[in-house]
């Protein structure tokens, strides 16, 4: 969601960033972009604890554009896409470049670092415990990992 131009969320959506609770690390520059959007304290709450948050919280944080009734999300997105397609493509392209210019290198570097760590964590005993617990429908026990 953090790399999308427009994000429309159903009022029935359940959102979370459960990386750590799964024994993983954030990916796709989430560790860079979430603190920029939310500030460090609120980002720590979302990224470290992974607690669910509401669609309206996502809008308030700048992660989503709007909350819509479940049956209207796709049609709304189509209307926005149709409107978007009427805009001058060169101006759109250059504006998007300008919007991302300052952070593009930093985002790419962060994605690379996160990708390496994510791959390592995916094979970690902690992640294995989290995945096994999920499939066994039990709470993971991380007490043996210090």
Q: Can you describe what each PLM-predicted range is?
A:
Residues 9-10, 48, 128-140:
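K/E-rich alpha-helical interaction surfaces of small helical-bundle regulatory domains
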Residues 8-13, 55, 59, 64-120, ...:
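C-terminal long alpha-helix characteristic of the crotonase
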Residues 29-33, 42, 91-94, 114-117, ...:
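Hydrophobic alpha-helical segments typical of transmembrane helices
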Residues 2-48, 60-61, 76-80:
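CoA-thioester-processing core
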């Amino acid at each position: 969601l953090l790399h999308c131009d427009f994000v429309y969320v159903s009022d029935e959506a359940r959102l979370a960033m459960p990386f750590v609770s799964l024994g993983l690390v954030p990916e796709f520059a989430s560790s860079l972009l979430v603190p920029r959007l939310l500030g460090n304290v609120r980002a720590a709450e979302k990224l470290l604890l992974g607690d669910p948050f509401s669609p309206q919280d996502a809008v308030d944080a700048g992660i989503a554009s709007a909350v819509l009734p479940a049956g209207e999300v796709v049609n709304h997105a189509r209307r926005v896409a149709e409107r978007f397609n009427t805009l001058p493509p060169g101006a759109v392209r250059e504006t998007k470049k300008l919007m991302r210019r300052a952070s593009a290198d930093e985002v790419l570097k962060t994605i690379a670092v996160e990708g390496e760590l994510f791959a390592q964590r995916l094979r970690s005993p902690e992640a294995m415990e989290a995945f096994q617990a999920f499939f066994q429908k039990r709470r993971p026990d991380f007490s043996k990992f210090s």
